[in-house]
């Protein structure tokens, strides 16, 4: 049995992904019962095993996907304490750090906690692990993200441009003002090129955990001049129900046959769709015991079946595009 905590944009995409691929029961909970019931009713036409439920019923699930706004730590602590595995889609640095601290709780209760199972972080970890197979060794990873999922994701993007970015540079964590460090990043079509800036993103923290050999890790997010100017003010324009076409760019640098090599791969898809498919595939793997080890993990870690998970994500319609040189 798989539970979904939150029936917004990401939660709906998780439910859609699971209703097609999974043959297990799916429980949907949202603070707005009407939203959860509407989602379950819509998907019940293709999967009769999905239904809306109350919060306490989720304790019966084997794994719960936290698809609502951050913070996820209090909710994750609640479920882990009941022995329920958790898949978190949070992309907030402080929240991810707090989730990592729940590793002992997960181990004590023989539960699995997956942190950052979204687009970035999440899909980015899969792509780094996949690209690393073409190198003798890797030492740099640079992530860029364009677009947002639902309204909560848009608000997080707004906050990410007003805080402090974090990056791993030659053996130490460096903090820089978010919104600085402009870099033109090319994403797969139809997204194209966007100016990207440092942001308060958890990718460097989680990527470094999955790949301890890295010397440099950075993460940037696309932003317009207006985004940067108003980043330190409350959002003046209400966010849209769902963002448009998004993009993810993963650049890996390392050595192969004694030469310096750079490889780049990208994804062009709605951010909420990628997050929903990734977290749904991870939850399904936990539900069928493909992932069974207790403790806290991030996607891309060598102890996880990353290749199988990435194959499942791509089979669900999320395609990766390699950048080729003329």
Residue ranges and their predicted role:
Residues 90-112:
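Rossmann-fold NAD(P)-binding glycine/threonine-rich loop
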Residues 48-59:
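Short acidic low-complexity segments
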Residues 63-79, 93-96:
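Beta-loop-alpha module in the N-terminal Rossmann-like domain of NAD(P)-dependent dehydrogenases
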Residues 5, 133-263:
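Active-site-lining helix/loop region of Rossmann-like oxidoreductase modules
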Residues 11-12:
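N-terminal Rossmann-fold NAD(P) dinucleotide-binding loop
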Residues 25-42:
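NAD(P)-binding Rossmann-fold cofactor-contacting core
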Residues 18:
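Aromatic pocket-lining residues of Rossmann-like dinucleotide-binding sites
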Residues 227-326:
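C-terminal active-site/capping subdomain that shapes the small-molecule cofactor and substrate pocket
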């Amino acid at each position: 049995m798989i539970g979904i905590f939150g029936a917004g944009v990401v939660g709906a995409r998780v439910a859609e992904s699971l209703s097609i691929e999974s043959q297990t029961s799916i429980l949907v909970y949202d603070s707005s019962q009407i939203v959860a019931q509407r989602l379950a009713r819509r998907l019940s036409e293709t999967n009769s095993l999905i239904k809306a439920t109350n919060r306490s019923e989720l304790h019966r699930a084997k794994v719960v996907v936290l698809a609502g706004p951050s913070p996820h730590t209090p909710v994750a602590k609640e479920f882990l304490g009941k022995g329920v595995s958790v898949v978190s889609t949070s992309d907030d640095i402080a929240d991810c750090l707090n989730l990592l601290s729940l590793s002992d709780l997960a181990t004590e209760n023989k539960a699995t906690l997956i942190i950052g199972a979204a687009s970035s972080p999440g899909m980015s970890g899969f792509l780094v692990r996949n690209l690393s197979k073409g190198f003798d060794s890797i030492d740099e990873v640079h992530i860029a993200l364009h677009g947002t999922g639902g309204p909560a994701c848009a608000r997080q993007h707004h906050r990410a441009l007003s805080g402090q970015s974090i990056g791993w540079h030659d053996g130490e964590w460096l903090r820089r003002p978010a919104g600085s460090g402009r870099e033109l990043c090319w994403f797969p079509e139809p997204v194209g090129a966007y100016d990207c800036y440092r942001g308060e993103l958890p990718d460097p923290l989680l990527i470094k955990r999955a790949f301890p050999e890295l010397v440099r890790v950075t993460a940037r997010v696309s932003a317009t001049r207006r985004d940067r100017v108003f980043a330190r003010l409350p959002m003046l324009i209400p966010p849209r129900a769902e963002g448009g076409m998004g993009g993810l760019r993963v650049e890996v640098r390392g050595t192969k046959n004694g030469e310096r090599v750079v490889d780049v791969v990208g994804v062009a898809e709605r951010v909420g769709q990628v997050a929903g498919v990734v977290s749904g595939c991870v939850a399904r793997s936990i539900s069928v015991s493909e992932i069974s080890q207790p403790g806290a993990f991030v996607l891309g870690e060598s102890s996880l079946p990353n290749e199988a998970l990435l194959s499942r994500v791509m089979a669900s319609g999320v395609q990766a595009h390699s950048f080729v040189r003329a």
